[in-house]
Amino acid sequence: MKKLLLLLFVGFTMSCSNNDVVVTFDDENSNAIRTHFQNYLNNDMDGLKELWSPDIKVYLNSKQAISLDDFVGLLEAQHAGFDPILMTFGEEGGEDLGVWVQTITYPAIGEYPSSTLTQSWFDWNATGKVSGKTIVLPAHIGFKWGEDGKIIEEYHNYDTQEMMAELALSQEME
């Protein structure tokens, strides 16, 4: 019985071994996303476009992708409706770390090729130009990289209710 338990333990331990997933924080892709976010904060749409593949698929809380033109229009509307816009990360009362960014490279598994994704977490803080109300949205954005070093898929996950309400106010005032 002891030998059987030992065999099961060794088998379990071996099955939990490293599967070649690599997580980095200060790599080329993570740093490119930090620059990408600075371009967003500076309302530099041309700078943002430099990192996007022309065929990028952008998903905003949905499995249905929106067009790059629609996405750029939304980003421009954010800057028209809010000032300032900040991206922060950290414990309340602690040091602001900016945006938390990490890149994960997954090995090929079965029919799936290897892939590299950069994940980011932050609080999107913005003050509405019309209402003067400051909103804080916890956000997660994931970026999938193509072989050419461009972003081919972008996944946005956050509650947009307050943001969209403020943008609607902005449009009513026009």
Language model feature labels by segment:
Residues L4-T13:
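Sec-dependent N-terminal signal peptides
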